[in-house]
Amino acid sequence: MGSSKLMVTCIVVAMLTISCDILSVEMGISVQALPPTCGPDCTGRFMNQDCSKYCAALSYKHGVCILFRGLPPRTSTLRCCCG
């Protein structure tokens, strides 16, 4: 009877250890560097400082307004890009 309790305890401890390792690996993946992304257009009211705040809220280090050249029917626009 005592050996079966010991075996169950060892199995439970092993399962908890494995699940903690899996959780730490999953958490490590979620905090890896995010790929660059571009968000809203930069305007007279939304410029580099606002863009930087916007990107920081999305867990990026910084954000800048970058000029995007559109296809011939479109004009060039400033876009807030995070990196």
Swiss-Prot record:
* Entry GO CC: extracellular region
First and last residue of the signal peptide: 1-24
Superkingdom of source: Eukaryota
What keyword terms does UniProt attach to this protein?
Antimicrobial, Disulfide bond, Fungicide, Plant defense, Secreted, Signal
Does Secreted show up as a keyword for this record? yes
The processes (GO biological process) annotated in the record are:
defense response to fungus; killing of cells of another organism
Kindly give the InterPro entries that the UniProt entry links to this protein: Defensin-like_dom
List localization entries. Answer: Secreted
- Taken from the UniProt record, the cysteine pairs bridged by disulfide bonds within this chain are 38-82, 42-65, 51-80, 55-81
Q: Which family does it belong to?
A: Belongs to the DEFL family.
Can you name this protein?
Putative defensin-like protein 67
Question: Which organism was this protein described from?
Answer: Arabidopsis thaliana
